[in-house]
């Protein structure tokens, strides 16, 4: 143990802060060769959290296509998805939206002055959150086309889409960049 936690370990620790009464399975759709065997019964899950990555969706590698395919399957069978950063980009792409390299710069460490819009102020994702806030972030890409029926929740000068809610198949997807 070198003392550095993976993104997955940090997410688990954060969730366990609120409750340890959860059964959490971890998969990597890019490298798990039997991904659908490992999670045969996606229907049993109450939710899914899809975290960050340094990949770019438009690179269109086999590893990225595997993730998009797996997300499509999750959207058919998992009711609640929290899509964080890369997870948002995969969820949007799987649902017919589009992600491209950002044209207004990048977030390198902190995303500044995220503004929650009127729809976001009503959404549980931002319950009790200040209307303008900063948050840790590393991203070079942005959602440029929203999936059908999406509700934009927040934006900043770098990314128009910082918070998003949409439904795809069975899933209610809450996404944050």
Map each language-model feature to its residues.
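N-terminal beta1-alpha1 cap of cysteine-dependent amidohydrolase-like domains
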Residues: 1-79
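Short alpha-helical
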Residues: 2, 6, 89, 159-160
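Alpha-helix N-cap/helix-start motif
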Residues: 4, 60, 84, 145-146
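Active-site phosphate/pyrophosphate- and oxyanion-stabilizing loops and adjacent acidic/basic residues
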Residues: 9-13, 89, 140
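A structural signal for short, well-ordered beta-strand segments and their strand-loop junctions
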Residues: 26, 82-84, 175
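Short glycine-/acidic-enriched loop or helix-start segments at secondary-structure transitions
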Residues: 36, 59-61, 92-94, 147, ...
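Cysteine-nucleophile active-site neighborhood
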Residues: 53-120, 134
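Pocket-forming structural segment of enzyme catalytic cores
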Residues: 97-177
């Amino acid at each position: 143990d070198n003392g550095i936690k993976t993104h997955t370990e940090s997410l688990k620790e954060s969730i366990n802060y609120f409750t340890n009464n959860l059964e959490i399975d971890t998969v990597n759709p890019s490298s798990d060769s039997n991904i659908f065997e490992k999670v045969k019964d996606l229907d049993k899950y109450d939710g899914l959290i899809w975290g960050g990555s340094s990949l770019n969706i438009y690179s269109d590698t086999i590893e990225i296509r595997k993730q998009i395919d797996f997300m499509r399957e999750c959207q058919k069978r998992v009711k609640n998805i929290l899509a964080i950063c890369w997870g948002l980009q995969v969820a949007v792409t799987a649902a017919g939206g589009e992600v491209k390299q950002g044209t207004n710069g990048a977030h390198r460490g902190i995303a500044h002055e995220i503004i929650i819009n009127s729809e976001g102020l009503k959404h549980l994702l931002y319950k009790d959150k200040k209307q303008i806030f900063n948050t840790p972030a590393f991203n070079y890409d942005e959602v440029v086309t929203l999936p059908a029926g999406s509700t934009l929740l927040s934006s900043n000068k770098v990314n128009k889409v910082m918070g998003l809610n949409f439904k795809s198949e069975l899933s209610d997807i809450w996404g944050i960049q």
